[in-house]
């Protein structure tokens, strides 16, 4: 997804890389009543977001950036590799209709967690594997899930599990990118429970 030249996007020129207290603070947004947030980094957020859109009980998804040192980064800033941000999807889910465990299962199935700072052809720290938790229960479930999956893997899982930090919503162009048609204008289904293969194209 590193296609800055094709999209006409680049670094905003932000040179002050002193850690921002805002960027390193907690995510202070509030989910809807009866809902909870979760954050996952699993490579390019386009395909990851579509996968979570299809989960029954997921009420909202947003592509964005987190875990960095710069306040309000642009896509260009993040792709420069100098801000420390990860591309993530923030998922809002109904606690009565969706379990955190089901979100974790989808997370593991969507990417190779044994590659460091890379998913397929996408290379950079922004593509690292990460689970960013909002509650002690989420942390507990995430760590238990990692341990179970590690037993099934020959290579070491590189996924980081950290507290959720400030979430920066990505530019509108990136939101629900594949369901809106992507580069070729061919929208992909967001129907709940849909198992159609996800085609990620820029």
UniProtKB/Swiss-Prot annotation:
GO biological process entries: response to light stimulus
Location of Phosphoserine modifications: 189
Tissue spec: Expressed in rosette and cauline leaves, and at lower levels in roots, stems and flowers (at protein level).
Localization, UniProt: Cytoplasm, Cytosol
GO cellular component: cytosol; plasma membrane
Reported pH dependence: Optimum pH is 7.0.
SUPFAM superfamilies: Peptide methionine sulfoxide reductase (SSF55068)
Superkingdom classification of source: Eukaryota
InterPro entries named in the record: Met_Sox_Rdtase_MsrA_dom (IPR002569), Met_Sox_Rdtase_MsrA_sf (IPR036509), MsrA_MetSO_reductase (IPR050162)
Example GO molecular function: L-methionine:thioredoxin-disulfide S-oxidoreductase activity
Segments for region (Disordered): 1-34
Catalysed reactions, semicolon-separated: L-methionyl-[protein] + [thioredoxin]-disulfide + H2O = L-methionyl-(S)-S-oxide-[protein] + [thioredoxin]-dithiol; [thioredoxin]-disulfide + L-methionine + H2O = L-methionine (S)-S-oxide + [thioredoxin]-dithiol
EC number, as in UniProt: 1.8.4.11
Protein keywords: Cytoplasm, Oxidoreductase, Phosphoprotein
Induction entry: By light in etiolated seedlings (at protein level).
Stated family: Belongs to the MsrA Met sulfoxide reductase family.
HAMAP family for this protein: MsrA
Biological function: Catalyzes the reduction of methionine sulfoxide (MetSO) to methionine in proteins. Plays a protective role against oxidative stress by restoring activity to proteins that have been inactivated by methionine oxidation. May prevent cellular oxidative damage due to light exposure. MSRA family specifically reduces the MetSO S-enantiomer.
Protein name from the UniProt record: Peptide methionine sulfoxide reductase A3
Species of origin: Arabidopsis thaliana (Mouse-ear cress)
Gene name of the encoded protein: MSRA3
């Amino acid at each position: 997804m590193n296609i800055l030249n094709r999209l006409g996007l680049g670094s905003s020129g932000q040179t002050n890389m002193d850690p921002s207290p805002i960027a390193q603070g907690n995510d202070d947004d509030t989910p809807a009543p009866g809902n909870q947030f979760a954050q996952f980094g699993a490579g390019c957020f386009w395909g990851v977001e579509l996968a979570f859109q299809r989960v029954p009980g997921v009420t909202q998804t947003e592509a964005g950036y987190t875990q960095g040192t710069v306040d309000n980064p642009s896509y260009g800033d993040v792709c420069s590799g100098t801000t420390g941000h990860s591309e993530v999807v923030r998922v809002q889910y109904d606690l009565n209709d969706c379990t955190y465990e089901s979100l974790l299962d989808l997370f593991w199935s969507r990417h190779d967690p044994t590659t460091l700072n890379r998913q397929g052809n996408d290379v950079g720290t922004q593509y690292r594997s990460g689970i960013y938790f909002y509650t002690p229960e989420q942390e507990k479930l995430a760590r238990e899930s990692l341990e179970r999956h590690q037993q099934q893997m020959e290579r070491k899982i590189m996924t980081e599990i950290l507290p959720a930090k400030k979430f920066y919503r990505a530019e509108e162009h990136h939101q629900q990118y594949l369901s809106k048609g992507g580069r070729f204008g061919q929208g992909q289904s967001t129907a709940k429970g849909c198992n159609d293969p996800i085609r990620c194209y820029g």
